[in-house]
């Protein structure tokens, strides 16, 4: 039995990189997984983990769209039941100087890295409050506390993610 046996974890941005690593680690520790990603390729990771004996559901959603998030979470909960752990991992990083960054690039970062976290947390939190149980993990970076010259969009969005988390324990 693993440390997370009997717990269901929703991991956003689970297809690759850190999100995939979190999914594999949680699976090794016995968690039931809900893997959320914008890419339908997330099904392949879910199939692989299911093939290794882990309980796993893949859902495709765009974290920028609250309706997409709500529909995906509804589908996942119909299959997996409650969500015990939320890992807000989905994020993007387009490198470039501040002066070269377009308004579209700025909005892209904000929509995924700030609003996306907001949308997923808002969809999951009410049930956790009602149960008086649940855990939310916010992925961030040291760039929340410093400015990276090659990535001016990262610092504000990482800082926003880190700072927003502070008030959540007081809710409910």
Regions found by a protein language model. Give the residues of each.
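Conserved glycine-rich cofactor-binding loop
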Residues: 8, 15-16
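Residue(s) in the substrate-gating loop at a strand-loop-helix junction
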Residues: 141
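A short, exposed helix-loop element centered on a Lys and neighboring polar residues
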Residues: 121-122, 167
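The beta1-alpha1 cofactor-binding region of Rossmann-like NAD(H)/NADP(H)-dependent oxidoreductases
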Residues: 60-72, 103
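Conserved glycine-rich Rossmann-like NAD(P)H-binding loop of the short-chain dehydrogenase/reductase
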Residues: 29-44
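Substrate-binding pocket helix/loop in short-chain dehydrogenase/reductase
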Residues: 97-98, 105-110
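Active-site loop-to-helix junction immediately N-terminal to the catalytic Tyr of the SDR YXXXK motif
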Residues: 101, 147-156, 168
């Amino acid at each position: 039995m693993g440390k997370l046996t009997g717990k269901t974890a929703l991991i956003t941005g689970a297809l690759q990189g850190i999100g995939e690593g979190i999914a594999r680690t949680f699976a090794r520790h016995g968690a039931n997984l809900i893997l959320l990603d914008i890419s339908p390729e997330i099904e392949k990771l879910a199939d692989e983990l299911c093939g290794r004996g882990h309980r796993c559901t893949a859902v495709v959603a765009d974290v920028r769209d609250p309706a997409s998030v709500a529909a995906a979470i509804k589908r996942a909960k119909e299959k997996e039941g409650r969500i015990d752990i939320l890992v807000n991992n989905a994020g993007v990083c387009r490198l470039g100087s501040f002066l070269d960054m377009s308004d579209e690039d700025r909005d892209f970062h904000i929509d995924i890295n700030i609003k996306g976290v907001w949308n997923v947390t808002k969809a999951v939190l009410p049930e956790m409050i009602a149960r008086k149980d649940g855990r939310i993990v916010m992925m961030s970076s040291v760039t929340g506390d410093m400015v990276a010259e090659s990535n001016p969009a990262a610092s504000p969005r990482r800082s926003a993610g880190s700072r927003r988390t502070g008030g959540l324990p007081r809710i409910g």
